């Protein structure tokens, strides 16, 4: 129970500080003991044997996934595999796509720089397929995970995949000739879908479907090249819709770093960093789900700046709303007498204040 309470305080403190460095977290942790004692308490917490992905995080995930309507899209669970790195740290991660963001599911800190290999990719995905057994899964990967060997390994019942391919990858034409994908004849504004094609000149890989598209513009800029997707989906549109969700894991990495928790500033050794990511995963998931509830309740305008819905304006993510909720509620609870007196003075705004108080009550119900 004491560990659980400490975890809740760490998560709440993190939402406000947006810093992953232990010294900064220890400064603000609301436990009435000496600073040095708080710092040591945090270090001991990160050394706990029970604080590991399979014992703690997998248990949370299995409980969340019971709410299938929340995490599935037309009966499918979308997961993305990607890497992020800074300095000597190199993390291979698989995440669950949720509400235009991604929730970390499993990760490994690689003891090398550069791209992961097939064995490492199969290992992390294998862990996930066990946790998600019973669900129809779509695996998404960028060109770093373009291996046809990975595609073959993913050809299993109730499992779909969309893996971006390099333009230099060879594809066998109807005439039996191999040519690079860049030679398939796509031009800006065109697309293609090839069924049952052989990729690469190596033997034994079987056939796949290949989707290709060259958008004229992306976010107002002309695109320089087309993209190609290795998939076992049966049509172009389904493959394109699925592949677009892959970008959500990149948004999650941004939230983990400078856009949210400043994970790269933790300066922890890999064995402690992996445990820290468990806590961040809990904090991130909590903020995202709370933010989604705030949006659904229609009280987002009390927490963050109202969204302008003209073209090009990026909307606030549920994570952004959920994280900023902590700031508003914390300061509200710090100045109850001031707020009460202000309401008495500004009687002409009383109706607005009452609406705001109701919004606060609704916001508190998300905890």
Regions found by a protein language model. Give the residues of each.
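Active-site- or DNA-interface-adjacent structural scaffold in DNA-acting proteins
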Residues: 15, 29-32, 36-87, 141-142, ...
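The alpha-helix within a helix-turn-helix
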Residues: 26
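Single, function-defining residue in the core of a domain
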Residues: 1-21, 56-58, 72-77, 88, ...
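Short beta-strand scaffold segments in enzyme catalytic cores
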Residues: 92-96
């Amino acid at each position: 129970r004491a560990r659980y309470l400490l975890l809740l305080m760490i998560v709440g403190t993190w939402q406000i500080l947006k810093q992953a460095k232990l010294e900064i977290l220890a400064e603000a942790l609301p436990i009435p003991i000496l600073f040095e004692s708080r710092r040591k308490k945090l270090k001991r917490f990160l050394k706990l044997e029970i604080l590991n992905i399979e014992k703690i995080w997998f248990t949370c995930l299995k409980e969340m996934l019971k709410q299938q309507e929340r995490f599935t899209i037309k009966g499918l669970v979308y997961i993305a595999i990607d890497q992020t790195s800074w300095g000597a740290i190199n993390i291979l991660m698989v995440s669950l796509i949720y509400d235009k963001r991604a929730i970390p599911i499993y990760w490994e800190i690689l003891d090398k720089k550069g791209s992961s290999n097939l064995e490492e990719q199969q290992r992390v995905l294998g862990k996930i397929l066990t946790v998600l057994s019973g669900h129809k899964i779509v695996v998404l990967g960028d060109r770093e995970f373009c291996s046809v060997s990975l595609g073959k390994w993913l050809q299993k019942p109730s499992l779909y995949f969309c893996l971006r391919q390099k333009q230099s990858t060879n594809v066998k034409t109807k005439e039996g000739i191999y040519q690079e994908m860049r030679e398939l004849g796509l031009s800006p504004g065109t697309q293609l879908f090839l069924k049952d094609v052989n990729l690469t000149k190596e033997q034994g890989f079987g056939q796949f479907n290949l989707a290709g598209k060259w958008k004229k513009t992306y976010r107002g800029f002309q695109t320089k090249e087309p993209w190609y997707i290795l998939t076992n989906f049966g049509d172009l549109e389904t493959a394109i819709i699925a592949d677009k969700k892959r970008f959500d894991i990149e948004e999650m990495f941004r939230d983990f770093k400078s856009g949210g928790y400043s994970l790269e500033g933790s300066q922890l050794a890999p064995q402690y960093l992996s445990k820290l990511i468990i806590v961040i995963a809990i904090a991130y998931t909590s903020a995202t789900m709370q933010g989604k509830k705030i949006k659904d309740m229609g009280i987002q305008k009390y927490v963050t700046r109202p969204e302008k819905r003209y073209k090009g304006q990026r909307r606030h993510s549920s994570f952004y709303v959920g994280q900023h909720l902590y700031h508003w509620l914390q300061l509200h609870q710090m100045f109850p007498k001031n707020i009460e007196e202000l309401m008495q003075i500004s009687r002409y705004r009383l109706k607005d204040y009452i609406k705001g108080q109701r919004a606060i009550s609704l916001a508190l119900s998300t905890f």
